[in-house]
Amino acid sequence: MEIVAENRKARFDYFVLQEYDAGMVLVGSEVKSLRQRKVNMGDAYVLEKDMELWIHNLHISEYNRSDRKNHKPLRVRKLLLRKREIHKIAGNIKVSGLAVVPLMIFFNNKGIAKIKIAIVKGKKLYDKREAIKTRDWQREKSRISRREV
């Protein structure tokens, strides 16, 4: 598995409730751009329309060696999942306070581009502060243990 991009901010801003791996409908120049790791998914989110999932604001840069038939960087892309997974995710989108965001884009062992999406719930400010304190304490603990050895 070759990781192309990771949305680390999503793990900080949200509680991850459930994760899914999905395929994406892409054109050739988008795949080539993904191989060059020219993707930004900081503002990306998933919406449901007609029992299909669509990812919005996923910026895949134009492939620089492509001709004039290049793709649009911010076009809406369809996600490919099983029907029961789509029903489950669509039901969670309608629940107040829950959202679906991308966590990671990767190429699987067969070389197919996949995206890991998650059903998330937003963190409050005090939850974010608690996460920072925990992370700092773990870092300090590892420094202390290295000094003692």
UniProtKB/Swiss-Prot annotation:
Q: Quick one: where is this thing mainly located?
A: cytoplasm
Key words of the record: Cytoplasm, RNA-binding
Q: Which GO terms describe its biological process?
A: trans-translation
Q: Which InterPro entries does the annotation name?
A: SmpB, SsrA-bd_prot, SsrA-bd_prot_CS
**What PROSITE patterns would the database entry show?**
SSRP (PS01317)
Gene Ontology annotations for the cellular component aspect, listed alphabetically: cytosol
Which GO molecular function, any one, fits this protein according to its record?
RNA binding
- Kindly list the places in or outside the cell where this protein is found, as annotated in its UniProt entry: Cytoplasm
Q: Which family does it belong to?
A: Belongs to the SmpB family.
HAMAP family assigned to the protein according to its UniProt record, in alphabetical order:
SmpB (MF_00023)
Describe the task this protein carries out.
Required for rescue of stalled ribosomes mediated by trans-translation. Binds to transfer-messenger RNA (tmRNA), required for stable association of tmRNA with ribosomes. tmRNA and SmpB together mimic tRNA shape, replacing the anticodon stem-loop with SmpB. tmRNA is encoded by the ssrA gene; the 2 termini fold to resemble tRNA(Ala) and it encodes a 'tag peptide', a short internal open reading frame. During trans-translation Ala-aminoacylated tmRNA acts like a tRNA, entering the A-site of stalled ribosomes, displacing the stalled mRNA.
UniProt name for this protein: SsrA-binding protein
Q: Which organism does this record belong to? A: Anaplasma marginale (strain Florida)
Gene behind this protein:
smpB
